Amino acid sequence: MSRGSTNIMLRKLITSLKKQDKAIWVRVAEELEAPRRKRAYINIYKINRYSKANDIIVVPGKVLGVGNLDHPVTVVALSFSKPAKEKILRSGGKVMSLYKAIQELNDFKGKTVRLMKQ
């Protein structure tokens, strides 16, 4: 019986997240280490309800396209459904993968960062 993900890219992502000096990336790595059946799947309407304009939303899982988004946010996630991506971009927000986020989002000063899971 194997332990952990057999997806090599996911393992590398978890390792690089743990090496970051920000507590939020370590927390995301812990969430991604959990079994796939416990991974977060968040719909757009929850992001809309619990965020404000220009927030950074981190989802350690997949973002799904149910609901509408009426303000711009930056959403960082492991993966996105096609309708979710379209709705986020249509509202003026940004879509970013976790791989890209750990390289580009180093400074969170003055920004609200929210970790969302079920």
Curated annotation (Swiss-Prot):
Entry's Gene Ontology BP terms: translation
Keywords: Ribonucleoprotein, Ribosomal protein
A Pfam family that the UniProt record links to this protein: Ribosomal_L27A
PROSITE patterns given in the database record: RIBOSOMAL_L18E
MF (Gene Ontology): structural constituent of ribosome
GO cellular component: ribonucleoprotein complex; ribosome
Family as reported in the entry's similarity comment: Belongs to the eukaryotic ribosomal protein eL18 family.
Database matches in HAMAP family: Ribosomal_eL18
Protein name, as recorded: Large ribosomal subunit protein eL18
Organism of derivation: Sulfolobus acidocaldarius (strain ATCC 33909 / DSM 639 / JCM 8929 / NBRC 15157 / NCIMB 11770)
Origin organism lineage: Archaea, Thermoproteota, Thermoprotei, Sulfolobales, Sulfolobaceae
Gene from which this protein is expressed: rpl18e
